[in-house]
A protein has these predicted regions:
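Phosphate-group recognition and catalysis centered on beta-loop-alpha active-site segments
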Residues: 18-274
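Bacterial N-terminal signal peptides that target proteins for export
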Residues: 1-9
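Bacterial N-terminal signal peptides
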Residues: 8-16
Length: 274
């Protein structure tokens, strides 16, 4: 009898962990950026190969109006050229090597257009597009979305720039839009800022679909409850710890952005703690 109970308990533990993995959307941060150069076709495709539910990419508007993948405002860190993305044409950006820094096997990898990246989205999966510039990119985003032929439920717009997500939601009402936020502590009050109430109010004012915040600000269950009570989605970034991911999953996070999608999914599906 004791053996049967032990077997039943083991099955429940495994089943419960599996539910965590199934309930949480695993989002590949800049593609599978732990293994491949970030924000490239190579990292995006690898993200899909690693069974990510979604892939997140960063975009800027080039000098000639193309929506291109890149994280920083300049190309210095990745390509060694200290020029703003916005001051370079796509032809100039395509001359840059954005793979060699990751290793010799990636030498020659180039900056892609969003158009090319959107074509990779498999059926039933979606792409989170983080806008790193201002709302001037929105008309070009619309052209890319229409050209892709992807359904609105396969596209998500996110940004730290409130005006961007506000205008994006007004322009693309059928596309999910989430407000990105990090946090800091107020030295005088000791309170976390911005507060969850402030974030919810801003999201509601722009009719956004929810929040996408740093996991470091998700220390209390109250944060989760308030966002859920407001009827909003709650996503987080950038989690490469299995312990943190499990804690957030148990509290009801909707999605986790990670550099290691396959690895994190395996950890969430496992009952073994590390």
């Amino acid at each position: 009898m004791k053996i049967r109970w032990k077997l039943l308990l083991a099955l429940l533990l495994v089943s419960g962990a599996g539910v965590l993995a199934a309930d949480v959307e695993i989002i590949a941060h800049r593609g599978a950026s732990y293994d491949a150069p970030e924000n490239t076709l190579e990292s995006v495709r690898l993200g899909w190969e690693q069974k990510a539910d979604a892939v997140e990419v960063d975009v800027f508007l080039s000098k000639d109006g193309e929506v291109v993948l890149h994280h920083d405002a300049t190309t210095k860190k990745i390509a060694g050229v200290d020029r703003k993305v916005a001051d370079q044409t796509y032809a100039e950006l395509r001359q840059l090597d954005v793979g060699a820094w990751k290793g010799s096997k990636w030498k020659g990898v180039r900056i892609p257009k969003l158009d090319a990246v959107l074509t990779t989205i498999p059926d039933g999966k979606r792409m989170f597009i983080e806008v790193k510039c201002g709302p001037e990119i929105i008309p070009a985003l619309g052209r890319s979305f229409r050209k892709s032929g992807k359904s609105p439920d396969q596209l998500v717009v996110i940004s730290f720039n409130y005006e961007v997500v506000k205008q994006a939601k007004a322009k693309f009402p059928r596309i999910k839009c989430f407000y990105l936020s990090s946090f800091k502590m107020d030295k005088e009050s000791g309170e976390q800022i911005p507060s969850v109430e402030e974030l919810i109010a801003k999201a509601k004012a722009a009719q956004l679909d929810g929040l996408n915040v740093s996991y470091k600000g998700l220390q209390s269950e109250a944060f989760f409850k308030k966002v859920k009570s407001a009827g909003m989605g709650l996503f987080t970034w950038t989690v490469n710890s299995s312990d943190v991911a499990r804690r957030l999953a148990k509290r009801g996070i909707d999605g986790i952005t990670t550099d290691r999608p396959a690895w994190l999914r395996e950890r969430l599906a496992s009952a073994d703690s590390e």
